[in-house]
């Protein structure tokens, strides 16, 4: 009976000592958190291993992440994975689709993003661009003659139109002089002509008898306007004037219309402010609808694919510029010892318990061996 009690005692003590020793060793990894002193003498094994080596741990964790976890090869392999690319493209298409089907107005979106001033800036910028383009255009064309400034097609159209213009002028003139207003105007012109020529009027009156001068002149004027020779004469005159105009400088236009007036007139016609305001009052969906399908089906996949290709080619440079090791090191360095302990224990809690139990098991086995040795020695 005493023999079995001795074996049980040695086994129990061995298990307790083994389990407690391992448990204490695990605790000494983290505790105490700070060095302990007896007088000026620092107690050995204080602080615990991890608090004492926390800075080194932070550095090593940073190196481990960069050298073994987030490696350029691993990230590059992920970026070139076909399933990953499909998933990313699908996600991008869904998100872009949500934005492009938004029924809120562009103005509301700008206000929401606190960039409502964009409307004023856009209006000013567009007007400034228009002004600069007009001034540059005028600056260039003011150095040309009309012949140089106008395209060849315009020259042809004008020259082909001159006979038609002559016919139109003569037709309108004929209609005018056939009317009562035209006859009255012609009569006044004749009266004014003979007003200072009294003797000539009496002489003409002797030849015409009771018929008024205007009744004789009006048919002749209309007849003259209807003759082919008159049309050719007017056509030749217009052609000569056109030839003269082609040789004149465009800059002469500035004497009739100032540059500022041209710019102002164009800006008034364009109505930049009203156009921008009308554009911003449209919903995002209205603005994007004409190009929505093209953007989602073609542009988004293309952009994502090119972005992933660029990322794959430059992943090493990106990681170097991110300084991930330093980021991990800085983050770990900011952890309190308690948080670091909780973090490690949350990952290795079960394994550390098993180490404690293993220590108890080994201690118990050693106790059994001791008990057997005592039995044989007796």
Curated annotation (Swiss-Prot):
Domain of life: Bacteria
Leader sequence segment: none
Pfam annotation, one family: DUF445
Compartments, record wording: Cell membrane
Topology within the bilayer: Multi-pass membrane protein
InterPro entries linked to this entry: DUF445, UCP032178
Keywords for the protein's UniProt record, in alphabetical order: Cell membrane, Membrane, Transmembrane, Transmembrane helix
Membrane-spanning intervals of the chain: 1-21, 357-377
Listed GO CC annotations: plasma membrane
Assigned protein family: Belongs to the UPF0754 family.
Protein name in UniProt: UPF0754 membrane protein BCA_0919
